């Protein structure tokens, strides 16, 4: 019984240590790599699902005002 508990404990410890090793070796994603959140990128900027230095897209509010201006002319 003791041997079985020790074996299971050692097995779980190895799994935990391997997970820690993978997490510490998993570095951030470089520019151009796919991302979902900013913390995944080295420069902490995820824009349109890609890591970038800064988001090169126009501000959404400015784009919305352009649409309102377009509809106002009709």
Curated annotation (Swiss-Prot):
GO MF: toxin activity
GO cellular component terms listed in the entry, alphabetical order: extracellular region
Residues annotated as signal peptide: 1-26
Record localization: Secreted
InterPro entries, A to Z: Conotoxin-I_CS (IPR013141), Conotoxin_I2 (IPR020242)
UniProt tissue specificity: Expressed by the venom duct.
Proregion span(s): 62-74
Presence of the UniProt keyword DNA-binding in the record: no
Source superkingdom: Eukaryota
Comment text on domains: The cysteine framework is XI (C-C-CC-CC-C-C).
Name of the protein in its database record: Conotoxin Vt11.7
Organism, as annotated: Conus planorbis
Upper classification of the organism: Eukaryota, Metazoa, Spiralia, Lophotrochozoa, Mollusca
């Amino acid at each position: 019984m003791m041997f079985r508990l020790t074996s299971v404990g050692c097995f779980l410890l190895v799994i935990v240590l391997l997970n820690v090793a993978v997490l510490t070796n998993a570095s951030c994603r470089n520019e151009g790599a796919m991302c979902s959140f900013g913390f995944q990128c080295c420069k902490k900027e995820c824009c349109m699902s890609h890591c970038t230095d800064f988001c090169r897209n126009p501000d959404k509010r400015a784009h919305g005002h352009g649409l309102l201006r377009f509809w106002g002319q009709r």
